[in-house]
Curated annotation (Swiss-Prot):
Belongs to the bacterial ribosomal protein bL36 family. This is Large ribosomal subunit protein bL36. Keywords: Ribonucleoprotein, Ribosomal protein. It comes from the Bacteria.
Amino acid sequence: MKVQASVKKICGSCKVVRRKGRVHIICTAEPRHKQRQG
């Protein structure tokens, strides 16, 4: 999980999810694409 100030989709499988006021990127195809804003 990368924690970054600015998160963006890396591939077509990445999805933007809001959890507890934070923005997360989840990816089913490539788990290394997981990110959290903050």
